[in-house]
Amino acid sequence: MERGYRKTRIGTVTSDKMDKTIVVAVENRVRHPLYGKIIKKTSKFKAHDENNEAKNNDKVLIMETRPLSKDKRWRLVEIVEKAK
Protein backbone atom coordinates (compact mmCIF):
# COMPACT_ATOMS: atom_id res chain seq x y z
CA MET A 1 0.00 0.00 0.00
CA GLU A 2 1.35 3.41 -0.96
CA ARG A 3 1.59 6.41 1.31
CA GLY A 4 -0.30 9.58 0.42
CA TYR A 5 1.41 12.75 -0.72
CA ARG A 6 3.49 14.33 2.06
CA LYS A 7 4.93 17.83 2.08
CA THR A 8 8.69 18.25 2.32
CA ARG A 9 10.69 21.35 3.19
CA ILE A 10 14.39 22.24 3.23
CA GLY A 11 15.48 24.55 6.02
CA THR A 12 18.14 25.46 8.55
CA VAL A 13 18.28 24.11 12.11
CA THR A 14 17.94 27.03 14.54
CA SER A 15 17.75 25.03 17.79
CA ASP A 16 18.81 21.53 18.83
CA LYS A 17 18.52 21.99 22.61
CA MET A 18 15.51 19.68 23.04
CA ASP A 19 15.81 15.90 23.25
CA LYS A 20 14.90 14.26 19.90
CA THR A 21 13.50 17.57 18.60
CA ILE A 22 14.92 20.27 16.35
CA VAL A 23 13.54 23.65 15.30
CA VAL A 24 13.87 24.24 11.55
CA ALA A 25 13.52 27.68 9.94
CA VAL A 26 12.19 27.51 6.38
CA GLU A 27 12.57 30.61 4.22
CA ASN A 28 9.80 31.47 1.78
CA ARG A 29 9.94 34.29 -0.77
CA VAL A 30 6.67 36.12 -1.45
CA ARG A 31 5.86 39.12 -3.59
CA HIS A 32 4.31 42.11 -1.80
CA PRO A 33 0.73 42.42 -3.11
CA LEU A 34 0.84 46.19 -3.70
CA TYR A 35 4.49 47.14 -4.19
CA GLY A 36 5.78 44.00 -5.87
CA LYS A 37 8.97 43.76 -3.79
CA ILE A 38 10.03 40.20 -2.98
CA ILE A 39 10.09 39.66 0.79
CA LYS A 40 11.68 36.79 2.71
CA LYS A 41 9.25 35.21 5.17
CA THR A 42 10.41 32.61 7.68
CA SER A 43 8.35 29.77 9.15
CA LYS A 44 9.61 27.68 12.05
CA PHE A 45 8.73 24.00 12.37
CA LYS A 46 9.48 21.59 15.22
CA ALA A 47 10.71 18.32 13.75
CA HIS A 48 11.41 14.89 15.24
CA ASP A 49 15.11 13.90 15.22
CA GLU A 50 15.22 10.34 16.58
CA ASN A 51 19.02 10.04 16.93
CA ASN A 52 19.81 13.67 17.85
CA GLU A 53 22.07 13.87 14.78
CA ALA A 54 21.22 17.36 13.45
CA LYS A 55 23.09 20.33 14.92
CA ASN A 56 22.66 24.11 14.72
CA ASN A 57 23.01 25.66 11.23
CA ASP A 58 22.77 22.29 9.44
CA LYS A 59 20.68 22.33 6.26
CA VAL A 60 18.04 19.59 6.61
CA LEU A 61 15.16 18.00 4.72
CA ILE A 62 11.99 17.51 6.79
CA MET A 63 8.79 15.67 5.89
CA GLU A 64 5.24 16.02 7.15
CA THR A 65 4.04 13.20 9.42
CA ARG A 66 1.33 12.34 11.93
CA PRO A 67 1.15 14.53 15.07
CA LEU A 68 3.94 13.45 17.41
CA SER A 69 3.22 15.99 20.16
CA LYS A 70 1.42 19.30 20.68
CA ASP A 71 3.66 21.15 18.21
CA LYS A 72 5.54 18.44 16.27
CA ARG A 73 4.08 17.52 12.87
CA TRP A 74 7.36 17.04 10.95
CA ARG A 75 10.26 14.61 11.03
CA LEU A 76 13.86 14.74 9.89
CA VAL A 77 14.49 12.84 6.64
CA GLU A 78 18.15 13.68 5.99
CA ILE A 79 20.88 16.20 6.66
CA VAL A 80 21.52 17.86 3.30
CA GLU A 81 24.58 19.85 4.39
CA LYS A 82 26.51 19.89 7.68
CA ALA A 83 27.36 23.25 9.29
CA LYS A 84 30.93 24.42 8.89
UniProtKB/Swiss-Prot annotation:
GO terms for cellular component: cytosolic small ribosomal subunit. The keyword rRNA-binding applies. Gene3D superfamilies: Nucleic acid-binding proteins (2.40.50.140). The keyword rRNA-binding applies. It comes from the Bacteria. One of its GO terms (molecular function) is rRNA binding. Keywords: Ribonucleoprotein, Ribosomal protein, RNA-binding, rRNA-binding. Coiled coil: none annotated. GO terms for biological process: translation. One of the primary rRNA binding proteins, it binds specifically to the 5'-end of 16S ribosomal RNA. Part of the 30S ribosomal subunit. NCBIfam families: PRK05610.1, uS17_bact. Belongs to the universal ribosomal protein uS17 family. This is Small ribosomal subunit protein uS17.
